[in-house]
């Protein structure tokens, strides 16, 4: 949920909608869910079913990319709902964990590579 503090002002600046992606069980109403692997198990992420429409252009923003599991699962949900991922943006990228390669996107931006 730390990505919210970056994503909300970016959405405001771009004059576009802000859609929440949260760990499973934290969003109200009907959601779609994707599961992903962690080093120590599995987890899930959800987006509300009506938050993204066919053809919406989506920038996925988070505070950190490590292994890329959360970002890849979020991207899968966006595409399942009909959205088009324009780019991924992160404050911090832990380059030794290879998350950017795991996502398999041509457009990944991070401010700090550590």
What are these model-derived regions, one by one?
Residues 14-17, 83:
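A short helix-loop-beta submotif of the ANL/AMP-binding
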Residues 16-58:
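Short, glycine/charge-rich flexible loops or terminal/linker lids adjacent to PRPP-binding catalytic cores
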Residues 8-9, 30-32, 98-101:
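Short, well-ordered secondary-structure micro-motifs
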Residues 72-114:
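PRPP-dependent phosphoribosyltransferase catalytic core
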């Amino acid at each position: 949920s730390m990505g919210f503090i970056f994503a909300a002002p970016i959405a405001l600046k771009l004059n576009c909608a802000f859609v929440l992606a949260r760990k499973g069980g934290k969003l109200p109403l009907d959601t779609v869910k994707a599961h992903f692997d962690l080093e120590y198990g599995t987890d899930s992420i959800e987006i509300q079913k009506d938050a993204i429409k066919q053809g919406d252009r989506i920038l996925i923003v988070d505070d950190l990319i490590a292994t890329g599991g959360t970002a890849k699962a979020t991207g899968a949900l966006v595409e399942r709902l009909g959205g088009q991922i324009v780019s991924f943006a992160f404050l911090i990228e832990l380059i030794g964990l290879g998350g950017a390669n795991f996502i398999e996107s041509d457009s990944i931006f991070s401010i700090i590579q550590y």
